[in-house]
Amino acid sequence: MSPKLFSITEKEQLKEKMFLSGLELLKEYGMTHMSVEKIAASAGIGKSTFDNFFMSKEDFVLQLIGFNRMRFWKAVQDMLGGREKLTIAESKQVLTMIINNKDSVYQYLTPENEEKLAAASPDGNKLDIDEETDTLRRLFGYFEGVRGDVDFGVVSNLLKILALTAENKTILHESAYDRTQEKLFGLLFGCVFKEGENE
């Protein structure tokens, strides 16, 4: 029996189906216990079809992260609704969404998982301040009231601290977690928005 040939549209639809079902498996099992077989079965395909799209489970998760990035930018465009800029309140929602999004892959990864992903990534998941600055500049270009003197390194680090806090929530005092997050977001907003406009 010859292998099924997919059109470009079918390939994209199938990949999206695998990403969405794989994300749910990641939430349920974590990366360690999420197998290629489980991903294939949940998407209604065979393992050999999965292997035509991805080199490994790690490759799948790296591409899932890229897929989520595309969904994030689409969500920003949807919020804009044809406008040039988001209000400060909407901009704060976007920054909060980066951290508190239930579909963020990072919160379901362990440090060991992240090491495996770094090893599987072509660039070793190297931190690149120029690339991060470009991404933040692009994002802040859609925000009203952004400071003229944004320190992109500090903002990037604050976003990482917020992400690490969310990922390691279990080692923090649960009763103070929301208040801690509020304080950290307050600091972040103060670094992004002009004085008097970050309320």
Feature-to-residue mapping (PLM):
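C-terminal peripheral helix-coil segments that are non-catalytic and often amphipathic
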Residues: 1, 141-145, 161, 165-199
